[in-house]
From Swiss-Prot:
It holds the Pfam family HHH_5. This is Holliday junction branch migration complex subunit RuvA. Residues 1-64 are annotated as: Domain I. It is found in: Cytoplasm. Residues 65-143 are annotated as: Domain II. Homotetramer. Forms an RuvA(8)-RuvB(12)-Holliday junction (HJ) complex. HJ DNA is sandwiched between 2 RuvA tetramers; dsDNA enters through RuvA and exits via RuvB. An RuvB hexamer assembles on each DNA strand where it exits the tetramer. Each RuvB hexamer is contacted by two RuvA subunits (via domain III) on 2 adjacent RuvB subunits; this complex drives branch migration. In the full resolvosome a probable DNA-RuvA(4)-RuvB(12)-RuvC(2) complex forms which resolves the HJ. GO terms for biological process: DNA recombination; DNA repair.
Amino acid sequence: MIGRLSGVLVYRGRDHIVLDVRGVGYVVQCSERTLAGMPAPGGPVALFTELLVREDLLQLYGFPTLLEKEWHRLLTSVQGVGAKASMSILSTLGVDGVGRAIALGDWGALRKAQGVGPKIAQRVVNELKDKGPEVMAMGGTLEAALDGVIEDGMAASEGIEPPSAARPAVPSAASDQAGALSALVNLGYGQGEAASAVATAAGEGAVGETDIIRAALRLLAPKG
């Protein structure tokens, strides 16, 4: 299994890149958001990867963060959602949007992804409503675990020091939401209701872990 690749960008296509790793060129499928963040050819790239193995195909999919990779694995666990549909969802919504849609039961947001119909969108929400919050809560943990690992690995494998933009990292918004979710769960709220409140708070403009917690607590407070 190939879990991560770091090397030099050779080519960027419409839905994939060619990554040179010590003289070997790997074709890696990526979401539109990931492709948009790629450097110019010749620049350093590090991606976490998932290998799809079929009788007639070996296909690598690349992700700038472990959080996005985990969402891809979770999405493709749903019947009817293949790698292509998962990449379309991630391209359209990003990791924050996917987590928010599932936490809020907003299958209409998932329908915006090309190739995702209403039945599939509803199935994703229904099957992942309990598992999604667990992935949302991983954001901060993954960020801490990655600190310094990518730079050291790329420097050792390629003899170059990658710029900070090339380092896969969990987006700060995802980390803030993960921290807020963890805090609410520690206060005794159920993971599902906490995730819904965090997603709503973030969607209404709360920024930063503290503000998200405060806004979520207001949403969770008994009415009347």
